[in-house]
Amino acid sequence: MPINKYKAAVVTSEPVWENLEGGVVKTIEFINEAGKAGCKLIAFPEVWIPGYPYWMWKVNYLQSLPMLKAYRENSIAMDSSEMRRIRAAARDNQIYVSIGVSEIDHATLYLTQVLISPLGDVINHRRKIKPTHVEKLVYGDGSGDSFEPVTQTEIGRLGQLNCWENMNPFLKSLAVARGEQIHVAAWPVYPDLSKQVHPDPATNYADPASDLVTPAYAIETGTWVLAPFQRISVEGLKRHTPPGVEPETDATPYNGHARIFRPDGSLYAKPAVDFDGLMYVDIDLNESHLTKALADFAGHYMRPDLIRLLVDTRRKELVTEVGGGDNGGIQSYSTMARLGLDRPLEEEDYRQGTDAGETEKASSNGHA
């Protein structure tokens, strides 16, 4: 039975930097908190685990190497006990979980968003299709079968995009065409315009993301938009500063950027600069009726006979096998299946109460 009215939570908090176990524990704590508050959905920021590597915007190659190694060591594999513990928390709290992680698959990292159902099943696994600027030094590109933004759920057609994907007109068009009703615009951590240094464009700062890009998404798509944002402390700034470089001493410009917008683009909620925790929203999907009546770019307000979007959702792999089918064609497979995300949770294992030491047995799964 579809649920049109429900409570949701948006995370605006500091990650546990480069600490996989600490990140999992904090994630489960927030899921528990949202569950106790009666939420049907909780939305986490981009690469919440193990935090956004903001240092990559500030260091040279040699300075980056020890930081990159630590970051890779604390990224999460999809078929790991850590991920199953998060899935179990979603199941135990009967809540949808949209979470951004640094995923390690073989030897490559991806900016990944996972959508977990109240049954603990992974119902969407998507990878950012193109890391932004210096992010290309850390992460790889998503593939055809891992960029679908929208999933049909009992709480509506729920979409997810990472960071600057939220201003990509083609990805927005795809989400609109899928009939998106509620959107998670997951953001990392970066400063506001008070830290702007010429000639760096204003595009590269947090307040345009929060107060221009995110409400524009709501207006253009007619959806509820939840925009979780990471926070950072002075101690966190030190962690993102290489040895021999003077760290910043004021974290204020980096904080207070999470937002919630209604389907007409009006602001529902924003946090105080010093707020760390969960922001709550009472979603009513029926609010989008009038915005969609005015402008439905997947329906009455579009001309597909004139403008169309070509989408290729096939997996492209380095090694491609031919044969095996009735027509001897090229074999294909699902990334989700290869990663084990199509397997249900085992009832006897990976409960929230699993001893932390037990998590070691699968924590290296998929790591280089």
From Swiss-Prot:
Temperature characteristics of this protein: Optimum temperature is 42-55 degrees Celsius.
This enzyme's EC code(s): 4.2.1.66
Keywords: Hydrolase, Lyase
InterPro entries: C-N_Hydrolase, C-N_Hydrolase_sf, CN_hydrolase, Nitrilase/CN_hydratase_CS, Nitrilases_CHs
Pfam families: CN_hydrolase
Catalytic activity from the UniProt record: formamide = hydrogen cyanide + H2O
UniProt cross-references to PANTHER family, sorted A to Z: CYANIDE HYDRATASE, NITRILASE
Function of the protein: Catalyzes the hydration of cyanide to formamide. Degradation of cyanide may be important for plant pathogenic fungi in infection of cyanogenic plants.
Name of this protein: Cyanide hydratase
